[in-house]
A protein has these predicted regions:
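Alpha/beta-hydrolase fold catalytic core
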Residues: 1-42, 63-66, 105-106, 275-288
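Active-site loop/oxyanion-hole signature of alpha/beta-hydrolase fold enzymes
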Residues: 19, 27-28, 32-34, 56-60, ...
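Active-site glycine-rich loops that stabilize anionic/oxyanionic intermediates
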Residues: 47-51, 114
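Gly/Ala-rich beta-loop-alpha elbow adjacent to hydrolase catalytic centers
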Residues: 112, 116, 120
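Flexible "cap/lid" loop of the alpha/beta hydrolase fold
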Residues: 121, 125-126, 131-164
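Conserved loop-alpha-helix segment in the C-terminal half of the alpha/beta-hydrolase fold
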Residues: 225-259, 265
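Catalytic active-site module of serine/aspartate enzymes centered on a nucleophile-bearing elbow/loop
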Residues: 250-288
């Protein structure tokens, strides 16, 4: 077994003890989360090609400071899919509201990575009183704006065709490297691939509909402190695009040095640091 394969095998072994799964019944729906620590809540929403487990290393770094909760988005992991065939961000935000209610979380620092940024922003827009601070990591803009309708149709068709043609395993093999910088090591690649290989086709299809049918800029929250960060080597949500989104959100922006799109996997220590600062800012009202 290679070093990378050993690494990928070791991290899942850490999950039961360090970031265990918990299943909650939300009405007729089951929702899966991973949870560690206690204190002020920070809630982590993953992107389209990932899952709750991808936050393991960040959770290990934050669990001594906060209650860390990462969901498997609807249709991911052991979370029930949404009822809508073509859900929008507000549908995912509705599930998140039910989850936070079930967990007795009144307020939290809310973190959205990539496509998870749409859900995070939509929730903050609708429930600003429940979000201490909104953190967007390499946020996906979405293709739902009228000016991007043609591009959105093309992206949707290609992603659905790729899924039908090669399946989840094929996508994990072909796309994992795209989520990392050219300098990423084999261990990071193995962990990205492990997470992507566990996608559920139905949940992935619904996430494609969200990506191609909704737009982040339609969900600008009011009165919620926000910050935006992006990997300096992110080739998917490029730094210049994330900087423009930060300007639209009137939010501070920074680069995560040496990280590609999967910043929490490639540079977990830097992501942990910026989220620790966001937690501190939520308590003091200022970023240090």
């Amino acid at each position: 077994m290679s070093v990378a394969e050993t690494f990928a095998a070791a991290l899942p072994d850490l999950l039961p003890q360090h970031f265990p799964e918990r299943l909650l019944g939300l009405g007729d729906s089951q929702q899966a989360i991973r949870e560690a620590g206690s204190g002020a809540a920070i809630v982590l929403l993953h992107g389209i090609g990932s899952g709750a487990a991808s936050w393991l290393q960040v959770a290990q770094g934050l669990c001594h400071k906060a209650r860390v909760i990462a969901w498997d988005a609807p249709g991911y992991g052991n979370s029930a899919a949404l009822a809508q065939a073509r859900p929008r961000a507000e549908d995912y935000a509705g599930r998140l509201q039910s989850l936070l209610d079930a967990l007795d979380i009144e307020r939290c620092v809310l973190v959205g990575h990539s496509l998870g940024a749409l859900t995070a922003a939509a929730f903050a827009q609708r429930h600003p009183q429940r979000v201490e601070r909104l953190v967007l990591l390499s946020p996906a803009r979405g293709y739902g704006a009228p000016a991007q309708a043609e591009q959105g149709r093309a992206v949707r068709a290609k992603r659905l065709d790729d899924l039908a043609r090669v399946g989840i395993a094929g996508l994990a093999e072909a796309r994992s490297a795209n989520l990392l910088s050219p300098a990423a090591d084999a261990r990071a690649l193995a962990w990205v691939r492990w997470n992507m290989a566990r996608l559920n086709p139905q949940g992935y299809r619904q996430a494609i509909e969200l990506l191609c049918g909704d737009a982040l800029l339609d969900h600008l929250p009011q009165g919620v402190p926000c910050e935006v960060h992006c990997g300096s080597a992110d080739g998917i949500t490029r730094p210049e695009d994330c900087r423009a989104l930060a300007e639209a959100f009137a939010a501070p922006f920074s680069l995560i040095n040496g990280a590609g799109h999967a910043c929490a996997i490639e540079r977990p220590e830097l992501v942990t640091g910026l989220l620790a600062r966001a937690l501190q800012a939520s308590l003091t009202g200022s970023l240090q």
